[in-house]
Amino acid sequence: MFNTNDRVVDICMGISFFIAFMYGAIMMFDSTFLIDRYDNPASNPDTQTISIFMFWLGAANIGAAFGVIYMGYKGLDRAYFAYAVPLLFFFIIWNIAPAQASGNYTGIVLLSISLVALIIARSRSGFPSNPFDIPKADKYFGTDDMITKVLLFLGLIGQGFNVIYYFVRPDAIIEDTPVLAMSVEAQQFATAMMLLSLAWVISLLYQMRAGLSMTMISVGLLISTIYFVGMINYMITSGGAGGNPLIGISFTFFFVGSVIVFFRNQSKA
């Protein structure tokens, strides 16, 4: 697996997969399991808001787990580590406040284990030990396909906008989405969504220099598909009431763009 005979790499990537898949499945299909352990009903009696945020973050975890499966067949991909390692580090820091408030440090421990596992796997992968020693492709994103370049640039701009706009209006995603209710916990999850966008910015900047990664394109396609299907399901079941048009447009463009980029570059998969 992973185009390596190193059993340590296999074990470390397996650990990372298990933790990502476990959290993804729980967040998407049984969010109350985590809400009961971290949420404070006194300050946030509305668990629907947290469930929506958990669905979004759960999709990101499922995407990360799928990336490990993809690399199991195709080999380790440096672009995946450029995405997953910063994301895990961000989420460990992000988990400190909820852990202190609830006294439950399980999340920090598991994320730390996953981070260490990825670092060990990367260190034994044969990649340059210096993570900033990034090979430079002949062209942006390493491709002559202008449509692919434009879509990836738009993705970079969109994710960068999410990060910048968070610092301008930290509560915008909550205030502009009627179905979401304001609370301390909701604000913390809004921060988590910004950190997810920041990890994507790092990954896209890496790919812009080193060349596009079919691992990350596949990860993005899976996440965007889950977001898009979830959005359609919400529109059907609720009639669209309480939604955020900007989020809907973003999810749609994310999905359509991911599909186009994937199929225009599938020969590299």
Q: What do the PLM-derived regions correspond to, one by one?
A:
Residues F18-M22, Q48-G72, I157-F161, V184-R209, ...:
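Core segments of alpha-helical transmembrane spans in multipass integral membrane proteins
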Residues Y80-I96, L196-S203, I217-Y234, T252-G257:
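Hydrophobic alpha-helical membrane segments
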Residues V9-M13, G75-P86, T148-L152, L212-I223:
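Membrane-interfacial loop-to-transmembrane alpha-helix junctions, especially the N-terminal start
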Residues I92-G107, F228-I247:
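Membrane-helix boundary connector in multi-pass membrane proteins
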Residues V9-M28, S114-A117, T143-V168, G257:
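Alpha-helical transmembrane segments of multi-pass integral membrane proteins
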Residues M1-F2, G126-I147:
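Membrane-interfacial, low-structure loops and terminal tails that flank and connect transmembrane helices
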Residues D36-T49, E175-E185:
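Perimembrane loop-to-helix junctions flanking transmembrane segments
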